[in-house]
């Protein structure tokens, strides 16, 4: 189809398609004209006056209502009077006011594409003749910091940065091979924190089956994961891991630890009952059985004692009210409680100390030590005496202490036992030096004097004479011994 030159120009001028040109300035000028037409169309939409077809011009020759005219009028009216500034401030209250540098060019000249005196020639000239201004320049950063965001660190560099506590994303390690190499690199650093950090990433991005399978052949990382799961209390994942590794005993122990999260005593007791048949070792199985039995008895004792305390009919609960519940307490604490509140009960009751001793196979030393502390706290000295008194087959009585009488003396003194009680048990200490030290420490004067006399140690007796009160019975006793002619002193 043949067209004349005039037809082609008419086509390109009337068509919405623009001919390609290598002239950048013409291209920019056309874009500016398009922008001007868009702005004028907005003005036509907003303007509701009936005389839209009348073009009004200002004293400068610019059409009234154009963008340049609006900017000048707004700047002139708002900046000239305080009322105008307040009005402008009210209209722009939702925006942050930024200081604007004074401008020497008008937007109308840009839209027309022609120059004005004292202004820039054109937009293209302004861009080409003047240096580019950046009103919000980006601060320069070290090149190394940009690598944190571009994620171009190697495996070794990533692990090194993790070790130093630097920011380093692991998300770029997407394939299983890359993740496993990252884990091996972390293990080779022998840093538990780095290994744990990588394991947390693998735990989040890998399925349980793949994670467990790969850790099964990496024992160092496996131990770190087990420790981490125990620390955060993720029992479910820990049970799945032990089940995958076929570690029956550790699986049972992890299941047993879940009782710590059960607060209700009855529910905890029922849970412990389900743990009895789990594949524990022989020693652990006995402990689990004892734990269940102990909690079962504590529930019975607690209910009975709460009733006795509320009724107020028992002297021991009136004089010494309970400070805490016995539920979920250790075995030794339960034994102390029984020795304190139920010491005289018969062996057939659950709260009897003797019953607890036999049921849980409490050693004699532990039982005597606990019972002594409980009865001495109540100042029940007859019970203390009976605790250490034994009879032989001929009916003779003898005092015997599985824990040693030196410990008995210390516990009695801690509970403010009378001097007569202390002296009785200090005399039962077999080692002479220990006896003298305890007697001197707790001011058992008669024991010190008699021991020095038996040792025929005149110098030590004279030295002790200066420690007693003058004119006291102890001083008179020392003087009588020193003046005795029947004693052959060794010094």
From Swiss-Prot:
Q: What Gene Ontology cellular-component terms does the record carry? A: cytoplasm; early endosome; Golgi apparatus; late endosome; recycling endosome; vesicle tethering complex
Phosphoserine sites (modified residues): 119, 122, 128
Q: Which domain of life is it from?
A: Eukaryota
Q: Which UniProt keywords apply?
A: Cytoplasm, Cytoplasmic vesicle, Differentiation, Endosome, Phosphoprotein, Protein transport, Spermatogenesis, Transcription, Transcription regulation, Transport
Phosphoprotein as a keyword of this entry, yes or no, is: yes
Q: Where is this region: Disordered?
A: 72-101, 121-141
Q: Which GO terms describe its molecular function?
A: protein-containing complex binding
Where does this polypeptide localize? Cytoplasm; Cytoplasmic vesicle; Early endosome; Recycling endosome
Q: Where is the composition biased (Polar residues)?
A: 72-81
Phosphothreonine PTM positions read 21, 115, 130
Q: Name the Gene Ontology biological process terms.
A: cell differentiation; collagen fibril organization; collagen metabolic process; endosome to lysosome transport; intracellular protein transport; post-translational protein modification; spermatogenesis
Q: What is its main location?
A: cytoplasm
UniProt subunit comment: Interacts with VPS33B. Associates with the homotypic fusion and vacuole protein sorting (HOPS) complex; impaired by VPS33B. Interacts with RAB11A.
Q: What does this protein do?
A: Proposed to be involved in endosomal maturation implicating in part VPS33B. In epithelial cells, the VPS33B:VIPAS39 complex may play a role in the apical RAB11A-dependent recycling pathway and in the maintenance of the apical-basolateral polarity. May play a role in lysosomal trafficking, probably via association with the core HOPS complex in a discrete population of endosomes; the functions seems to be independent of VPS33B. May play a role in vesicular trafficking during spermatogenesis. May be involved in direct or indirect transcriptional regulation of E-cadherin.
What does the similarity note say?
Answer: Belongs to the SPE39 family.
Tell me what else is known. Answer: Vipar-deficient inner medullary collecting duct cells display abnormal expression of membrane proteins such as Ceacam5, structural and functional tight junction defects and reduced E-cadherin expression.
Identify this protein by name. Answer: Spermatogenesis-defective protein 39 homolog
Q: Which organism is it from?
A: Mus musculus
Provide the taxonomic classification: Eukaryota, Metazoa, Chordata, Craniata, Vertebrata
